[in-house]
Amino acid sequence: MANLGCWMLVLFVATWSDLGLCKKRPKPGGWNTGGSRYPGQGSPGGNRYPPQGGGGWGQPHGGGWGQPHGGGWGQPHGGGWGQPHGGGWGQGGGTHSQWNKPSKPKTNMKHMAGAAAAGAVVGGLGGYMLGSAMSRPIIHFGSDYEDRYYRENMHRYPNQVYYRPMDQYSSQNNFVHDCVNITIKQHTVTTTTKGENFTETDVKMMERVVEQMCITQYERESQAYYQRGSSMVLFSSPPVILLISFLIFLIVG
């Protein structure tokens, strides 16, 4: 880890040093230099933007003031104010006009709330969070009747589980046990309120289904917890702290 931080430090120092040298180089095209910054101006260094069809002042086909085919004020074919063929203010011919454009659609707050629901703390449940939706697992219960009953009624069972952060439990079994109990309780109360009741067979199958989903949720939380711990170790190492301090010094300076 220390070697990785040192190599990253060397790489960023070399990169920022090269950028610093580039910033100090003089830019061409300024005042009293060879390159011209404006079209139509003769200079020893050449013209970076050659005139299109005689673009100087007062030319018969240029874009100057009051010319027959130019884009100045009040010309019939120019791009000035209120002209019938121009791309000026409020005209139909201007493909890049910023006026009269439809406003951008606003973000639907319901969609934002739905996207933030997974993993969010559920109010009124004492710190429980609602996991993301899962596919209901394929489970065999040991008899053709129960297997068929499960396939026909699996849509009535939960596809999300309630859980607390894994660091509040001493083992996976405790996490899964609590997850199963709170999930079945909440789902049963919600469904019963809608007028639907569960039989003993339903409860038995829900316990198996929710148990598998809670195990999956525990594995996801374990992986995320490990990744967060690895990130904290990486950013707390002395080489990385030195690198971040050096980058802040370069940006501020």
Swiss-Prot record:
It is found in: Cell membrane; Golgi apparatus. Residues 26-108 are annotated as: Disordered. InterPro entries: Prion, Prion/Doppel_b-ribbon_dom_sf, Prion/Doppel_prot_b-ribbon_dom, Prion_copper_b_octapeptide, Prion_N. A lipid is attached at S230 (GPI-anchor amidated serine). Cu(2+) 4 binds at H85, G86, G87. Residues 1-22 form the signal peptide. Coiled coil: none annotated. Residues 52-95 have a biased composition (Gly residues). Sequence repeats lie at residues 51-59, 60-67, 68-75, 76-83, 84-91. Residues 231-253 form a propeptide. Its main location: membrane. Disulfide bonds join C179-C214. Residues 23-230 are annotated as: Interaction with GRB2, ERI3 and SYN1. Keywords: Amyloid, Cell membrane, Copper, Disulfide bond, Glycoprotein, Golgi apparatus, GPI-anchor, Lipoprotein, Membrane, Metal-binding, Prion, Repeat, Signal, Zinc. Glycans are attached at N181, N197. Cu(2+) 3 binds at H77, G78, G79. The normal, monomeric form has a mainly alpha-helical structure. The disease-associated, protease-resistant form forms amyloid fibrils containing a cross-beta spine, formed by a steric zipper of superposed beta-strands. Disease mutations may favor intermolecular contacts via short beta strands, and may thereby trigger oligomerization. Contains an N-terminal region composed of octamer repeats. At low copper concentrations, the sidechains of His residues from three or four repeats contribute to the binding of a single copper ion. Alternatively, a copper ion can be bound by interaction with the sidechain and backbone amide nitrogen of a single His residue. The observed copper binding stoichiometry suggests that two repeat regions cooperate to stabilize the binding of a single copper ion. At higher copper concentrations, each octamer can bind one copper ion by interactions with the His sidechain and Gly backbone atoms. Monomer and homodimer. Has a tendency to aggregate into amyloid fibrils containing a cross-beta spine, formed by a steric zipper of superposed beta-strands. Soluble oligomers may represent an intermediate stage on the path to fibril formation. Copper binding may promote oligomerization. Interacts with GRB2, APP, ERI3/PRNPIP and SYN1. Mislocalized cytosolically exposed PrP interacts with MGRN1; this interaction alters MGRN1 subcellular location and causes lysosomal enlargement. Interacts with KIAA1191. Its primary physiological function is unclear. Has cytoprotective activity against internal or environmental stresses. May play a role in neuronal development and synaptic plasticity. May be required for neuronal myelin sheath maintenance. May play a role in iron uptake and iron homeostasis. Soluble oligomers are toxic to cultured neuroblastoma cells and induce apoptosis (in vitro). Association with GPC1 (via its heparan sulfate chains) targets PRNP to lipid rafts. Also provides Cu(2+) or Zn(2+) for the ascorbate-mediated GPC1 deaminase degradation of its heparan sulfate side chains. Belongs to the prion family. It is linked to PrP is found in high quantity in the brain of humans and animals infected with the degenerative neurological diseases kuru, Creutzfeldt-Jakob disease (CJD), Gerstmann-Straussler syndrome (GSS), scrapie, bovine spongiform encephalopathy (BSE), transmissible mink encephalopathy (TME), etc. This is Major prion protein. The lineage of its organism: Eukaryota, Metazoa, Chordata, Craniata, Vertebrata.
